[in-house]
């Protein structure tokens, strides 16, 4: 039997399948788009094409669009699934920072169990959407934004509100501030917000999941801000789906 996890996030929909030992045997990702129902149908189409919707396979759905997965056997909160996925990827103890499209989560794990968590889901500042908006204003991709920031000198973006921060960036552009300096200010703003949420992780292993886990410069900056080496891996983007799959498979 395989366990199948479907994580319908605000930006991307992820699918993972694991075997009885918790090893990932399939993963898939697609933009969520406008409709969670359409995202769930796209995930189902992938699973059917891959031959993974056998009757003896269990499906667990998570993420903000989890209730749109009509073929799921169970729905589980994203905090529980991200904790379970991170424990499987990195180990049972530590702090997990998940930067999503519309929220940021910090999850404390002990013996593979979520002990507490913090979530910023009221404001886009410190999220992937914030970076996306700022990159658009600078006419670059998110990866190009990080490359620019690496060679830039920090300029202060003081607002914690995305709308006001966007106005600050527009003003800096108008004043002729070098683009790389603005990019560095944007990265520093995000890292500062996330590090503030994770201030209670001192002395713990810290792991990064979500869409920023492939952004090396942000990982470096976050490691510096937290005075530790923030660890991640190529599968960390799928942590929520992997956690859901592990629950579906009954993996401890």
Q: Where do the language-model regions lie?
A:
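Conserved phosphate-binding catalytic cores of ATP/NTP-utilizing and phosphoryl-transfer enzymes
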Residues: 65-116, 243-248
């Amino acid at each position: 039997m395989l366990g199948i996890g479907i994580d319908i996030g605000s930006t991307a929909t992820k699918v993972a399948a694991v075997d009885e030992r918790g090893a990932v045997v399939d993963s898939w990702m697609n933009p969520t788009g406008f409709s969670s129902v359409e995202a769930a149908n796209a995930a189902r189409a992938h699973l059917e094409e891959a031959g993974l919707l056998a009757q003896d396979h269990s499906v667990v759905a998570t993420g903000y669009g989890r209730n749109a997965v009509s073929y799921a056997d169970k729905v589980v909160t994203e905090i529980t699934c991200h904790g379970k996925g991170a424990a499987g990827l990195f180990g049972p103890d530590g702090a997990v920072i998940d930067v999503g499209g519309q929220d940021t989560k910090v999850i404390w794990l002990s013996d593979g169990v979520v002990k507490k968590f913090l979530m910023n889901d009221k404001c886009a500042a410190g999220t992937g959407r914030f970076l996306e908006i700022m990159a658009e204003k600078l006419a670059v991709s998110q990866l190009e934004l990080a490359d620019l920031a690496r060679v830039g000198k920090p300029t202060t973006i003081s607002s914690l509100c995305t709308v006001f921060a966007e106005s600050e960036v527009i003003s800096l552009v108008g004043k002729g501030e070098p683009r790389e300096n603005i990019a560095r200010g944007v990265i520093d703003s995000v890292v500062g917000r996330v590090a503030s949420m994770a201030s209670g992780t001192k002395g713990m292993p810290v792991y990064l999941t979500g869409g920023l886990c492939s952004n090396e410069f942000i990982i470096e900056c976050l490691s510096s801000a937290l005075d530790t080496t923030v660890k991640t891996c190529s599968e960390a983007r799928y942590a929520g789906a992997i956690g859901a799959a592990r629950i579906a498979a009954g993996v401890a």
